[in-house]
């Protein structure tokens, strides 16, 4: 429900997204590089999914998890970019209240799913390096599928209360969001009622999901490092080589996320463009960089991509 400043019920059931505060005049031109990054992200992640699906030798847990990561990256960037581009190019700044809640749920739940998949990938590397003889029996295809389903259920279940809590709040101050899309931290600050439940639950989610996942990933790599240090130099190089891409993906996801969360929680200036810029980085950079990192650092994927380009080049020749 939304109410007017006098406390009466209002017919307004929408929010206004202003895009990048302080950069309104530049938004039209900024949309072009953002659109290019979005297209690169979608194309890159679709390429990863296609390669893993069509290359039988890549039907292993690590690459199946990579496909899950690519699918989530496509969805998380698509949940925000079309509306953002509509704001920047067509000044379509309004978003219906329920649509805002749906977008909020999509962005936050997909982020939770991505964190879970990154944790699963760390577990895969731990088993492959520390217990190589048990890898095939521990991470079977049915078990990998169950982990993927668990990632979806966990992300959705943790974030489902957020729109429910927001739905209960009255909004009598303003319906203007200094942002390009709807995030829980921004919407709850517009409420004219006590938001402690939203704040506390938001912190619980960050600690129990993102915080716990990052700690478990760090712990798994400590165990991996302990095992690798006892190997020969050649074996060390091979083991580290299989982990580089995942470590990069972890940093690409968690560093912007933690930075964004800290700025949102502790920033006093609502009109500052910093949280919005960080949010755009958080939702666009991982989907763009993950396929590049895995394409460059993973030999099997790199060779398959080069083969695709080779076939496409010869097919275009007269």
UniProtKB/Swiss-Prot annotation:
Tell me the organism: Homo sapiens (Human)
Q: Which InterPro entries match?
A: GPCR_Rhodpsn (IPR000276), GPCR_Rhodpsn_7TM (IPR017452), Olfact_rcpt (IPR000725), OR51/52/56-like (IPR050402)
In which broad location class does this protein mainly occur, judging by the first location in its UniProt entry?
A: membrane
Which Gene3D superfamilies does the record associate with it? Rhodopsin 7-helix transmembrane proteins
Q: How does it sit in the membrane?
A: Multi-pass membrane protein
Q: Which residues lie on this side of the membrane: Extracellular?
A: 1-31, 82-100, 167-198, 261-275
What name does the UniProt record give this protein? Olfactory receptor 51E1
Q: Which residues lie on this side of the membrane: Cytoplasmic?
A: 53-60, 124-145, 220-239, 297-318
**Keyword Nuclease belongs to the record:** no
Q: Glycosylation annotated at which residues?
A: 8, 91
Family the UniProt entry places it in: Belongs to the G-protein coupled receptor 1 family.
Give yes or no: UniProt keyword Transmembrane.
yes
* One cellular component (GO) term of this entry: plasma membrane
- Give GO MF terms, alphabetically: G protein-coupled receptor activity; olfactory receptor activity
Which tissues does the record link to its expression?
Highly expressed in prostate. Very low levels may be detected in some other tissues, such as placenta, skeletal muscle, heart, ovary and testis. Up-regulated in prostate cancers.
Q: Membrane-spanning regions, if any?
A: 32-52, 61-81, 101-123, 146-166, 199-219, 240-260, 276-296
Instruction: Spell out the subcellular localization from the entry.
Output: Cell membrane
Please name the SUPFAM superfamilies in this protein's record. Answer: Family A G protein-coupled receptor-like
Q: What does this protein do?
A: Odorant receptor.
What are the cysteine partners in each disulfide bond?
Answer: 100-182
Superkingdom in the source lineage: Eukaryota
| Entry keywords, A to Z | Cell membrane, Disulfide bond, G-protein coupled receptor, Glycoprotein, Membrane, Olfaction, Receptor, Sensory transduction, Transducer, Transmembrane, Transmembrane helix
């Amino acid at each position: 429900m939304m109410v007017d400043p006098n406390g009466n019920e209002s017919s307004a059931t929408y929010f206004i997204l202003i895009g990048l505060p302080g950069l309104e005049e530049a938004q039209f031109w900024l949309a072009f590089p953002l659109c290019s990054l979005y297209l690169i992200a979608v194309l890159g992640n679709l390429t990863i999914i296609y390669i893993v699906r069509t290359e039988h030798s890549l039907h292993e847990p690590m690459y199946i998890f990579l496909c899950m990561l690519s699918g989530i990256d496509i969805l998380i960037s698509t949940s925000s970019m079309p509306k953002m581009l509509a704001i920047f190019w067509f000044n379509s700044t309004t978003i219906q209240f329920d649509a805002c809640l749906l977008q909020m749920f999509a962005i936050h739940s997909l982020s939770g799913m991505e964190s879970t998949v990154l944790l699963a990938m760390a577990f895969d590397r731990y088993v492959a390096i520390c217990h190589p003889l048990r890898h095939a029996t521990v991470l079977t295809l049915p078990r990998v599928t169950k982990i993927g389903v668990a990632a979806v259920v966990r992300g959705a279940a943790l974030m489902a209360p957020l729109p429910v809590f927001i739905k209960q709040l009255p909004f009598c101050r303003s319906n203007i969001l200094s942002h390009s899309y709807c995030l829980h931290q921004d919407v709850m600050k517009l409420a004219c009622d006590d938001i402690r439940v939203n704040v506390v639950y938001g912190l619980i989610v960050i600690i129990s999901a993102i915080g716990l996942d990052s700690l478990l990933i760090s712990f798994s790599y400590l165990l991996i490092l302990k095992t690798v240090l006892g190997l020969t130099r050649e074996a060390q190089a091979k083991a580290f080589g299989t982990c580089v891409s995942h470590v990069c993906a972890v940093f690409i996801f968690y560093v912007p996320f933690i930075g964004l969360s800290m700025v949102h929680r502790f920033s006093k200036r609502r009109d500052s463009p910093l949280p919005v810029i960080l949010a755009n980085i958080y939702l666009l950079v991982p989907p763009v960089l993950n396929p590049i990192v895995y394409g460059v650092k993973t030999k099997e994927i790199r060779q398959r991509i080069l083969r695709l380009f080779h076939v496409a080049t010869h097919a275009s020749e007269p």
